[in-house]
């Protein structure tokens, strides 16, 4: 019973739509009706500016950190995997917004930061380099998501961490399908483009 409650808690934690809340509170706008319509920090940055985006980013990052801490505290590697993936699923399919949320990148980053700070550092450098040279946040997100399980495996992380990396990569890439199509045809918005 206690384990089930923790799993529900992790999903609900992931479901807290910080991008929506901060945009609504500070700009009185509905992020779902602005820019790409995505409930994530990148869309907040492009539509509401860096200040609001930073708050949204930190909120989503914190969700991942807390979910990883909860999962780790159970002492079970299986429960850890389920807890953190439920948090990411909660972010993507939030009960509080009719199951239409973000793409799971920042919440995943919070989880990896808690579990594997060394891997996070490597992937962050790669992400920043890609975004700096291409101005495509989506390309950076997709690339580091794909690299996550490979880097985790190469650095000898526990099997549960590698599984988490594989599942996160699958979720992130799947929910970037439209971005991938736009990258291919050259219509993807850059971080410097205003919505």
Curated annotation (Swiss-Prot):
| InterPro entries in UniProt | G3P_acylTferase_PlsY
Cell membrane is among the record's keywords:
yes
Q: How does the UniProt record describe the way this protein sits in the membrane? A: Multi-pass membrane protein
Q: Which leading EC class covers this enzyme?
A: transferase
Q: Which Pfam families match?
A: G3P_acyltransf (PF02660)
- Transmembrane domains' residue ranges: 3-23, 51-71, 79-99, 111-131, 153-173
Substrates-to-products reaction catalysed: an acyl phosphate + sn-glycerol 3-phosphate = a 1-acyl-sn-glycero-3-phosphate + phosphate
Question: Which HAMAP family does this one have?
Answer: PlsY
Describe the subunit structure: Probably interacts with PlsX.
Q: What is this protein called?
A: Glycerol-3-phosphate acyltransferase
Q: Which organism is it from?
A: Syntrophomonas wolfei subsp. wolfei (strain DSM 2245B / Goettingen)
Taxonomy of the source species? Bacteria, Bacillati, Bacillota, Clostridia, Eubacteriales
* Gene encoding the protein: plsY
């Amino acid at each position: 019973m206690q384990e089930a409650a923790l799993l529900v808690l992790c999903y609900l934690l992931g479901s807290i739509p910080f991008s929506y809340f901060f945009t609504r509170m500070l700009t009185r706008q509905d992020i779902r009706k602005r820019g790409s319509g995505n409930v994530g920090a990148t869309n907040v940055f492009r539509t509401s500016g860096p200040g609001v985006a930073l708050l949204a980013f930190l909120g989503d990052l914190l969700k991942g950190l807390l979910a990883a801490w909860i999962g780790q505290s159970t002492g079970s590697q299986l429960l850890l995997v389920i807890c953190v993936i439920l948090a990411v699923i909660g972010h993507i399919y939030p009960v509080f917004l009719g199951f239409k949320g973000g793409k799971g990148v920042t919440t995943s980053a919070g989880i990896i930061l808690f579990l594997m700070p060394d891997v996070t550092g490597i992937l962050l450098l790669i992400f920043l380099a890609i975004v700096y040279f291409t101005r495509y946040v989506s390309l950076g997100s997709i690339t580091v998501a794909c690299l996550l399980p490979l880097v985790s495996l190469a650095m000898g992380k526990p099997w549960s961490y590698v599984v988490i990396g594989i599942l996160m990569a699958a979720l992130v890439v799947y929910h970037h399908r439209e971005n991938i199509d736009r990258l291919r045809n050259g219509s993807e918005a850059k971080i410097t483009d205003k919505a």
